[in-house]
Design a protein with these regions (language model features):
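ATP-dependent adenylation/nucleotidyltransferase module used to activate substrates
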Residues: 2-165
Length: 165
């Protein structure tokens, strides 16, 4: 290591060493590595299905593409494998166009849409009926946001459980 490294370079090298990451990112190699990881997981567990909620953001688009590639790889080997993408809106989502654009890129084997609004609203109503009081509307909205996240998780786990995933 050269003594004339800038502090940023030195910090970057420390981070690279501490996290054991490659100093150069090879996108094709990382794509293959992550796809193999998902395929290996299904192979080793005997499961047949990957399930993922697609929000319309970059993270779920990327993960959805990886999941679809993994099941296609397994099918090319003669294995039974499926990717189920899920839309989990709370009523009508403002970002639905972005989610649909992402789904067009992913091209999942199956798409399932489950509106979480009835379940989320029922839980909030049950909390009110049980005597839960919130500090203000913002606090209640925060709690409702957490309820929505849990309802999405419940839906995905239920679908995975129904499809060997």
């Amino acid at each position: 290591m050269s003594a004339d490294l800038s502090p940023v370079d030195a910090t970057q090298r420390e981070i690279i060493a501490a996290l054991h990451v490659a100093p150069v990112f090879d996108a094709a190699a990382e794509l293959a590595r992550r796809t193999d990881f998902l395929a290996d997981y299904l192979r080793s567990t005997g499961l047949k299905t990957l399930v993922l909620g697609i929000s319309g953001g970059v993270d779920s688009l990327t993960a959805g593409c990886l999941a679809q590639r993994a099941v296609e790889k397994l099918r090319a080997e003669g294995r039974d494998a499926t990717f189920i993408a899920m839309r989990l809106p709370y009523g009508v989502q403002r970002d639905e166009a972005e989610a649909q654009a992402g789904l067009a890129v992913i091209r999942p084997d199956r798409l399932l849409t489950v509106d979480i609004r009835p379940a989320a609203d029922a839980m909030l109503a049950a909390l009110h009926a049980g005597g839960q009081v919130f500090r203000d509307a913002a606090h209640e909205d925060f709690v409702l946001g957490n309820i929505k996240a849990r309802q999405r998780m419940i839906a995905q786990f239920a679908v995975a459980g129904a499809h060997d995933g």
